[in-house]
């Protein structure tokens, strides 16, 4: 019979199970396990014991994932999504990641609106489901005018993808105020503007999705991107606060919020 002599292995399995239990439940559930950890090390000499502990760890991990999914969806479901009726707004979508998002939506014939000061490639607009509005999202009046026109001519958007962003590759002491304010206006403050314009209609219907494009720089900065990293880190707080307000202040549990950490951006 398979025999494990390592005295430390028993502690390893128990630690894995405890960590998973902490995520799935709470620290209170860990007290019995913590007591076991304080006991003298006992060797695992039986295959059944090792197998049992492995199954427990896997089970707790699966339970944790299931509970996390429920939490992210506010413990509710929404079967009303019909992509032939949904309307998506994407900011900064004339190039880069935004353009790719629009391309994928166009392939699915999902009605999509680009808000960008720079026009997209003409080939994109040949798709009847894609529309373009020349909008500087740092100017609230332009955003508001575009939002009203979309709502009047079509309907209220149900998905908002705040994709627009700019970079600034300079040492902090070499930046000037104009550059820094422009970066903050595009990367951070514009998202307050677009959400204030498009979210009320979503709340009214308790149906919608807000996507925030953050970055790996939200957590890991480096030289010459201090301002950029700060703007992206602020989006984490924006996303988390928005999600809480939707549930606690507006009772709009079916409106989803997604935070995207784009690598190398």
UniProtKB/Swiss-Prot annotation:
The chain crosses the membrane at residues 6-26, 47-67. NADP(+) binds at residues 89, 136, 163, 228, 232. The active site is at 216 (proton donor), 228 (proton acceptor), 232 (lowers pka of active site tyr). InterPro entries: NAD(P)-bd_dom_sf (IPR036291), Sc_DH/Rdtase_CS (IPR020904), SDR_fam (IPR002347). PROSITE patterns: ADH_SHORT. Keywords: Glycoprotein, Membrane, NADP, Oxidoreductase, Transmembrane, Transmembrane helix. It is a multi-pass membrane protein. This is Dehydrogenase RED2.
